[in-house]
């Protein structure tokens, strides 16, 4: 049961973090003048629209994975340079901000847990979920700062 709780927490955390990351790219591209992601149905917080099933399974079980890239057309940006910059930076910024938000939630989860005798699967899930939210947000932020195409 412990394995299942950990895999569930990891799956839900990576789903939330990657969905926020991809949505940020789509939203900022739209605000900069490119409706391509909206037309493709990708400007949504629905995780099913952003995930490659194999990439998600690989992420949960192998520790690495991928989501479908958000389609953008740079020619539609009102200001080409700033549109490209902000659309690319949006995922990193959202991951950084979400790590900043998820860390206090993780600290609260640890304080909420109490003593070892009182722990339940719900406590374990809450701790693991908030821990993975923070860790994935921060690691995606750092990983996406690496200067490799198409990050």
Q: What is the meaning of each model-derived region?
A:
Residues 1-151:
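Hydrophobic transmembrane alpha-helices and their immediate loop junctions
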């Amino acid at each position: 049961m412990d394995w299942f709780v950990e895999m569930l927490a990891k799956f839900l955390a990576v789903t939330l973090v990657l969905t926020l990351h991809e949505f940020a790219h789509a939203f900022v591209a739209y605000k900069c003048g490119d409706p391509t992601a909206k037309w493709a149905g990708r400007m949504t917080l629905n995780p099913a629209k952003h995930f490659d099933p194999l990439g998600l399974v690989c992420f949960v079980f192998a520790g690495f994975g991928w989501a479908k890239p958000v389609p953008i057309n740079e020619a539609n940006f009102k200001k080409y340079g700033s549109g490209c910059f902000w659309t690319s930076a949006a995922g990193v910024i959202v991951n950084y901000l979400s790590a900043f938000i998820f860390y206090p939630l993780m600290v609260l989860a640890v304080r909420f847990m109490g003593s070892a005798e009182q722990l339940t699967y719900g406590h374990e899930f809450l701790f693991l979920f908030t821990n993975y939210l923070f860790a994935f947000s921060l690691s995606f932020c750092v990983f996406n700062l690496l200067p490799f195409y198409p990050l």
